[in-house]
Amino acid sequence: SRGLGDVYKRQMYNSARSCPSRANLLTGLYPHQTGLGHMDGSHPAWPKGYSGFRSNSDNVTIAEVLKDAGYFTAMSGKWHLGNKSNPILRGFQEYYGLLGGFNSFWNPAVYTRLPKDRTPRHYEEGTFYATNVITDYAIDFIDQAHQEKKPLFLYLAYNAPHFPLHAPKEVTDKYMSLYMQGWDKIRDARWKRIVDLKLMQGKPALSPRGVVPESLFEDETHPLPAWDSLTKDQQTDLARRMSIFAAMVDVMDANIGRVVDELKKNGELDNTFIMFMSDNGACAEWHEFGFDKQTGVEYHTHTGEELDQMGLPGTYHHYGTGWANVCCTPFTLYKHYAHEGGISTPCIISWGNHVKNKGGLNHQPAQFSDIMS
């Protein structure tokens, strides 16, 4: 994203899943204190900590605080804090994005513009891709704040690279030769780079190849298979899945560059505090080979024309535990778990000339609640 990153903070701890982390980030409270101790669903029999995101009668969001302080507050992207509230009711003046947790990146009908009296942007058929459009609105909001001469608080919450894995084919194709090397070689290469860059303190060691955890879809925990034990068709299918994931990150990175360029154009970049982080570790759902429909259980190996169509409109895929183990290098376990693989993700910080140690590495542990509090 064009040089963004004055400080790389290695230990920024989240709450292991989307909803709890977002509630934690926006309120500075532990997820249970906001009603999102698990996810965004609720049930009358559940205790208060699991009752769903509560109103501002007992918590306040960073957007509400900054709005009262005179900021222009806007959000573009994934809300995923349940249907008891929405961004406008919780302090954001402008919103565009996905109110739920995940959906198609190709279908504009599942995205929402709020307040309801706003006129949404128009996109010709076949040109909509969510990551690009979320950025279009983010840039609109940046420009609106600049025109109104107000300080800006923008919460830019991309749904990429969450499943379903969707990306432009030409970007996906760039990564196929890399990921055909397989998850064992790539995990080893990532570990070597971590060591060479001195990203870990002390004398760290790479954890063994991971496991597929017991779950609703797996009767018992079992080891991940070695890449070389898979058939060529399985390897090609899995490499395609990871290539789509990489393409989603690639497109997101380019769009962050667009945001940075807009701030620079408006003369606001050096005066803007930017944090980039993730709401959880890599997603291992639900077995080593991923899944192909929203049920989470259906999977088959794609070949031929079907392989080429992966990631395009009308498809639905996830990459599975094998690649999640790579994405969490060098840690153990994944999203859902309170192990490092689930809760420890990097944070990149930029703040123009206000940062003393530009390009530095910070090992001080922090947690999402620290941002609001």
Language-model segments: residues:
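Formylglycine-dependent sulfatase
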Residues: 5-373
